[in-house]
Amino acid sequence: NDAAAAFVLMSESTAKERGLEPLAYLKAWAKAGDDPRNPPKAGNKAFKLVLKKAGLTIDQIDLFEIQEAFAAQCLYNIRSLEIPLDHYDRINVNGSGISLGHPLGATLALRVTALVHEMKKRNARYGMVGTPGAGGVACVGIFERP
C-alpha cells in the first residue's frame, strides 16, 4: 500500500507560543522486541509495558488503535491484554490495517492521527495506539486528551 502521513509533536510551551491547542498529550510510550517468528509476543510486551509506565489499567483506556496487518495478530493482543468484551466497541472504531491498508512507513502516523481525532470526537480521555510487532519489534503509545 502507498500512503503518506505526518503529525506534529511539540512541547506544551511551544504550542502556547504559537497559539495552538494540543489535540492530545503523549502520556507514555514503550517499545519491545521478541522472536520475529512470533510477532504478537513483542506487541503483548509493549502494550503491557506502556500501561505500567502510564500507571493505567486496561479498563481506563477509552479507545484502542491496534494495527491489524493480520487478524490473528490483533486478536492475540486483544486477548492477551484481556480487553473486556464490553470494550470491543472501542477497538479500531474506524477500521484497521486490513480494511484501511498498511503502508509500512506511514502506518503508525496514520493510526496516531486517527486515534487523537477520534478521541476528540468522542471526548475520550485515554487512547492507546500500537503496532503488534512486525518483525519482532513493537511500539505502543498512550495519549491523553487535555
Task: Mark where each language-model region is.
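Claisen-condensing/thiolase-fold acyl-transfer catalytic domains that form or cleave C-C bonds
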Residues: 1-146
